[in-house]
């Protein structure tokens, strides 16, 4: 911290003491506002300067917020007060507010939170303003804000001190308001479709429902190892068994993996399950829901991302994973008959694989390394190999593949879904195959979950399921390049 900053803080501490000496509480209590800055503008900006003079008796307002600018000398001054909706100018005159309140005004610093009661008027330049009749200090700020002309430029500081970012960067505030709206519209859409929102445990006895490394914790009283959930899936499907036919949960998921522009150790997902549906129905639902959210929150289903127009309005492409790989590389995995042939093709095309990988894993590596980043417009990739889809139903026409899809937009995965595997015998066999992979060194392979198998043995109806990473969806709809831009408090390495 610079010497100048220390000096500014010292001055503010002295002002704080002066307030106490005068019997003024520098951390005040409730203040009744008549509205936000946007409300005042909507109601009063339509009038001319002269009309506002005529309406002065009816234009009494009360506004509160943070002082962001301040200017003027002598017996009057202007400032801008910022609230959630934006900024509005205030005008403070000694002969209007009195000596004591004008002294408060003179000693106020940028960053202080104030309340102003007054009447509406327009300046000679036509700016709608509040002429103060009463000026109240609500909270004394003891630290100066970042430079008003440059805002908070250090990207890491923006993430570590999000509160400063929200104060100084209007775009950040808009992003997080839109994040809330996106989640709300998701709920509205599903509730209107008859889905029931539920809550399931975040600490699991078995880490299941996804291929990921879990965070491990310990329950002292029970002397039990527990895992922070890596997916919501298996508990929701137990509810389908129990007769709750359309369920969803929006919640935090935890994966003990790397941090990047696309990944945070804890993130928000929605998972939903619908009895008597299949992955085609879930494709339709996903496309309709995302389009609805974009229209409701942004006013358009054509959105800008990284300089590219993403068309969520037109019908989304649907492409089998084998066809996608064939289009990109010329390799037709329908014709590949063995793991050895797949490995030879990987070597020929420069695909990095592990020695333990089989046909399905290698096909998926072809896709991830040669196709994924090219899928800019919304594209459903379906038909994933059985080896990498332990919870999805096999395709009845070709059991090498499953009735599963992933949604790709701007070159990254946004959703994962499938017709759920409801055959308990097949499911147990898949879990056993996953255990074999774990024994060969795949630490992301699925554990055996006997309790889930038991639930399936009571009978789960044909079901379609979906998982969407909400953070990535918010990135898309707010044109944010990093997941940290859409998390209020992203994980940061310790200083």
Swiss-Prot record:
Chief localization: cytoplasm
Keyword ATP-binding: yes
EC primary class: ligase
The organism's place on the tree of life at top rank: Bacteria
Textual note on the cofactor: Binds 3 Mg(2+) ions per subunit.
PROSITE patterns, sorted: AA_TRNA_LIGASE_II
One GO-annotated biological process of the protein: lysyl-tRNA aminoacylation
Ubl conjugation is among the record's keywords: no
GO molecular function terms attached to this record: ATP binding; catalytic activity, acting on a protein; lysine-tRNA ligase activity; magnesium ion binding; transferase activity; tRNA binding
GO cellular component: cytosol
EC number: 6.1.1.6
Binding-site list for Mg(2+) 1: 406, 413
Essential cofactor(s): Mg(2+)
InterPro entries: Aa-tRNA-synt_II, aa-tRNA-synth_II, aa-tRNA-synth_II/BPL/LPL, Lys-tRNA-ligase_II, Lys-tRNA-ligase_II_bac/euk, Lys-tRNA-ligase_II_N, Lys-tRNA-synth_II_C, NA-bd_OB-fold
Binding site for Mg(2+) 2: 413
Keywords: Aminoacyl-tRNA synthetase, ATP-binding, Cytoplasm, Ligase, Magnesium, Metal-binding, Nucleotide-binding, Protein biosynthesis
Catalyzed reactions: tRNA(Lys) + L-lysine + ATP = L-lysyl-tRNA(Lys) + AMP + diphosphate
Gene3D superfamilies given in the database record: Bira Bifunctional Protein, Domain 2, Nucleic acid-binding proteins
Localisation: Cytoplasm
HAMAP family xref list: Lys_tRNA_synth_class2
Subunit structure and binding partners: Homodimer.
Family: Belongs to the class-II aminoacyl-tRNA synthetase family.
Protein name: Lysine--tRNA ligase
Originating organism: Staphylococcus aureus (strain MRSA252)
